[in-house]
Amino acid sequence: MVSSVKMILALTVLATVACTGYAIKCYQCDSLTNSECGKDIKSDSSLVLDCTKMAPPRFLQNFFPVRNATGCMKQTIDIPGNPQIVRSCYFGNIADTKVGCQTDPSLTINKLLSCEVCTEDECNGTSSLAPIAGVILLFFGLARLLA
């Protein structure tokens, strides 16, 4: 009986962790309107957005049948003589960023200088080991419970 309860608990925890893995959270800001979004962003939860609440930009919607974000991105865009950093959710194929990284074609004066794409929560900002440490602790706690 106790073994069955432990197994159900373990499966519930694993299912919860797996489900939250699909909802990626990314920094959403630009350095033009928010100086905190510059080259070295400080950890600020007010700039973090749950990407499930965001649709792809209108100019990309014809390219992607799936409307879920697949990662986070950090773009450096040159607005004639003034490089700006834009952080947002990424929609598209992580392995082929040509389409997903493009800028709005109606803004013809903007030039994309770089685009970095990643697939972990808040990875388009300052890196943090806190999420990794939490998963490791959860794993060892679950292993101890099942032992």
From Swiss-Prot:
Name the UniProt record assigns to this protein: UPAR/Ly6 domain-containing protein CG9338
Lipid positions (GPI-anchor amidated asparagine): 124
Compartments (UniProt record): Cell membrane
Keyword Membrane tagged: yes
PROSITE patterns referenced in this protein's UniProt entry, alphabetically: PROKAR_LIPOPROTEIN
Record InterPro entries: QVR-like, Sleep_regulator
Disulphide linkage map: 26-72, 29-37, 51-89, 101-115, 118-123
Classification via Pfam families: QVR
UniProt-annotated glycosylation sites, renumbered to this chain: 68
Species annotation: Drosophila melanogaster
Residue ranges, Extracellular side: 24-126
Stretch forming the signal peptide: 1-23
Propeptide segment residues: 125-147
Family according to the record: Belongs to the quiver family.
Biological processes, Gene Ontology terms: regulation of synaptic transmission, cholinergic; sleep
Membrane topology: Lipid-anchor; GPI-anchor
Record-annotated membrane-spanning stretches: 127-147
